[in-house]
């Protein structure tokens, strides 16, 4: 019997009361909708709550007694899941903010590279235009100078012409005075007036005719001619005229040939290739915790073992031993297909004896792959790896067009002209490659080339001039005589994109001499135990960016040429930078996870932009950062800042990415006009930010309200990104 005053609403249908017990479902209470058509307990055995037997109630309560602890456990589990979810989401949110900052930083680097290239092109255009301007000025000055001399002579003759005529007439008058004085005086006056009116229009030829006539008259009267001032002027002009004619006009004609009218053209196909390559510069990786990863790996391994026979992936058919698997990083996907993960690309291992997934973008071919011709149908195939032992023919047309990335190991078949498709833009020769690379085997479509410890020497022409980025990896031991690494014949010419611009040298065994690094190289990276001495002149003056990481031989003065604009010291670089190592002329300087490298004078006064990032571990005592630095970037440094760490020359300051040093008043100088803050782990106080600041940009966990404690002027511009 149910008391009428007690509401017994159904949890599923809140507008209905519980009236029944389901006899088929552990006596779960139900309402009329629960047992109706479409309800969960339709056609189940039921018993009315109004007439329920005591035994049924006891049975239900005992069931509830067993169920309730599980409910409590479920609630606790749900609370734990909720807590874990919040923690994971907070990590995701934090990583999201870091990713946004990383994107901004990386694309800023790309923008800087493009800006530098643009400046180089504009500088080259300006230089060419200045040369053309000089040619024009030289020709104009030469011709105008000659014209001025002639004009001066003409003016002198015209100015003196009247006097000459007057003198001639006067002399005639004097000679005839004895015969008829009065008449001749009248005639002389008339002649003088006529000569004065007419001689202004006389040409040089007319003047000369008059002078010749006068001289002849004098010669007839007397053998001795008296040279007057007018004749002297004509004699001088005669000399200058001969000098003008003797001056070879070929100089100006040759100058005309020196004009250089250029039209800048861009390789749109190459630009499109670069744009497509830019899409491959990033990847998304799951940051799962270790336990989840271990569980997933164990599950994958169990699945693989259980289904080993069904998929024919047993050890007897596998040509890759454990060492090679470790070297190649062989993994197994959710369908038990093996693949090699390299440079964010998956290469699925193909064997003609085993099942293989269709339409994969990346395939690795080993010694049991059979003919590759059947893969011409796969239009999705973009990435190919030829593994050690590959022995199939590589005649032209075997590797299908459409391949973009190609990696070649210790294959047993030679490469010929046409073996590598013209669509390949990225090519890698892995350790052990032992085939000849004659000129023409590598086509001019290749932009990115990586070479490991290959066993055959390179010759001039082995590397095509189209290669834009070249990396020589650990163990490379082939000669690098001048010409092996191609260069553009025109110094620092980015317009044609010919010649290696980006060169990365790992722990190579080849010696570097002057000329080994071509003059086309724009950025040079030395890393991973690079152990060659950098004598002055080895790095050519074309290089504008030098990146150093884990090099073992000390730098000396002159190792880095004065023409370099940017120097980066990456994780693992551990050499003391004595004054002069970084030359005057460098504008941008970046330090990453390095420690105790700097002394006063290490940083030259030419530096405009300075960065300390990702675990930089040195106290920036006053004087380390030199006056002249205008932009300063601080990210995740491990030592506190002190007063006067930042000089007054700095006007732009960026502090971000886990910066956890105190910003006590005075640390940031009053010279700062623009301040960027992001992901700080430090508390701001009044005075942390000088009140002279003009602009603040906020990233990550920094909100505008967190600046209230600084009591900034309302005129300060604050941006949240």
Curated annotation (Swiss-Prot):
The keyword Methyltransferase does not apply. Transmembrane segments: none annotated. The keyword Coiled coil applies. InterPro entries: FNIP, FNIP_repeat. Keywords: Coiled coil, Repeat. It comes from Dictyostelium discoideum. CDD domains: Bbox2. This is FNIP repeat-containing protein DDB_G0290617. Residues 242-329 form a coiled coil. It holds the Pfam family FNIP. Residues 286-321 have a biased composition (Low complexity). It comes from the Eukaryota. One of its GO terms (biological process) is regulation of cell differentiation.
């Amino acid at each position: 019997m149910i008391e009428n005053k007690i509401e017994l609403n159904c949890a599923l249908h809140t507008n209905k009361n519980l009236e029944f017990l389901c006899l088929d479902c552990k006596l779960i209470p139900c309402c009329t909708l629960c047992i109706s058509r479409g309800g969960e307990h339709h056609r189940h055995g039921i018993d009315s709550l109004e007439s329920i037997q005591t035994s049924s109630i006891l049975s239900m309560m005992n069931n509830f007694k067993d169920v309730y602890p599980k409910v409590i456990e479920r609630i606790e589990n749900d609370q734990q899941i909720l807590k874990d979810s919040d923690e994971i989401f907070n990590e995701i949110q934090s990583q999201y903010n870091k990713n946004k900052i990383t994107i901004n930083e990386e694309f800023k680097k790309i923008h800087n590279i493009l800006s530098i290239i643009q400046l180089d092109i504009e500088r080259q255009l300006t230089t060419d235009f200045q040369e053309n301007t000089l040619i024009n000025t030289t020709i104009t000055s030469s011709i105008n100078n000659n014209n001025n001399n002639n004009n001066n002579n003409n003016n002198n003759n015209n100015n003196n012409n009247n006097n000459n005529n007057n003198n001639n007439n006067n002399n005639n008058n004097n000679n005839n005075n004895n015969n008829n004085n009065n008449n001749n005086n009248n005639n002389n006056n008339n002649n003088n007036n006529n000569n004065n009116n007419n001689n202004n229009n006389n040409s040089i030829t007319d003047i000369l005719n008059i002078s010749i006539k006068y001289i002849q008259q004098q010669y007839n009267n007397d053998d001795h001619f008296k040279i007057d001032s007018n004749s002297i002027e004509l004699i001088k002009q005669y000399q200058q005229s001969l000098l003008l004619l003797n001056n070879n006009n070929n100089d100006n004609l040759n100058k005309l040939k020196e004009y250089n009218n250029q039209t800048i053209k861009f390789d749109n196909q190459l630009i499109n290739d670069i744009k497509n390559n830019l899409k491959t510069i990033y990847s998304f990786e799951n940051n799962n915790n270790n336990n989840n990863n271990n569980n997933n790996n164990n599950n994958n391994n169990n699945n693989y073992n259980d289904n080993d026979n069904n998929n024919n992936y047993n050890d007897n058919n596998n040509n890759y031993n454990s060492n090679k698997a470790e070297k190649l990083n062989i993994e197994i996907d959710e369908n038990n297909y093996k693949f090699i993960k390299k440079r964010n690309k998956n290469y699925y291992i193909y064997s003609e004896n085993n099942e293989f997934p269709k339409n994969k973008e990346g395939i690795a071919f080993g010694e049991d792959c059979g003919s590759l011709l059947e893969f011409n149908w796969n239009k999705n195939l973009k990435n190919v790896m030829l593994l050690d032992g590959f022995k199939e023919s590589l005649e032209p047309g075997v590797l299908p067009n459409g391949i973009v990335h190609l990696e070649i190991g210790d294959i047993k078949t030679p490469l010929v002209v046409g073996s590598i498709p013209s669509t390949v833009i990225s090519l890698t020769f892995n350790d052990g490659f032992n085939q000849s690379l004659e000129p023409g085997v590598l086509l001019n479509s290749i932009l990115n080339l990586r070479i490991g410890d290959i066993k055959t020497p390179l010759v001039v022409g082995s590397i095509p001039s189209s290669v834009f980025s070249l990396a020589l990896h650990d163990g490379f031991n082939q000669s690098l005589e001048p010409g092996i690494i191609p260069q553009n014949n025109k110094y620092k010419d980015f317009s044609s994109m010919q010649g290696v611009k980006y060169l990365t040298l790992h722990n190579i065994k080849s010696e570097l001499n002057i000329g080994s690094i071509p003059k086309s190289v724009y950025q040079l990276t030395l890393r991973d135990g690079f152990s060659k001495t950098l004598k002055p002149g080895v790095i050519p003056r074309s290089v504008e960016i030098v990146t150093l990481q884990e090099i073992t031989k000390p730098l000396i003065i002159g190792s880095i040429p004065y023409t370099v604009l940017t120097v980066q010291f990456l994780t693992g670089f551990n050499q003391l930078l004595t004054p002069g190592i970084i030359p005057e002329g460098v504008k941008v300087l970046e330090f990453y996870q390095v420690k105790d490298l700097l002394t006063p004078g290490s940083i030259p006064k030419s530096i405009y932009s300075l960065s300390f990032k990702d675990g930089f571990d040195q106290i920036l005592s006053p004087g380390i950062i030199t006056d002249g630095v205008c932009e300063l970037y601080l990210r995740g440094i491990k030592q506190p800042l002190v007063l006067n760490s930042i000089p007054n020359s700095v006007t732009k300051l960026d502090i971000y990415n886990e910066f956890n040093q105190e910003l006590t008043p005075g640390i940031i100088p009053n010279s700062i006009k623009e301040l960027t803050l992001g992901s700080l782990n430090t508390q701001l106080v009044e005075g942390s930010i000088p009140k002279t600041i003009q602009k603040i940009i906020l990233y990550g966990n920094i909100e505008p309200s967190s600046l209230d404690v600084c009591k900034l002027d309302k005129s300060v511009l604050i941006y949240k990104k």
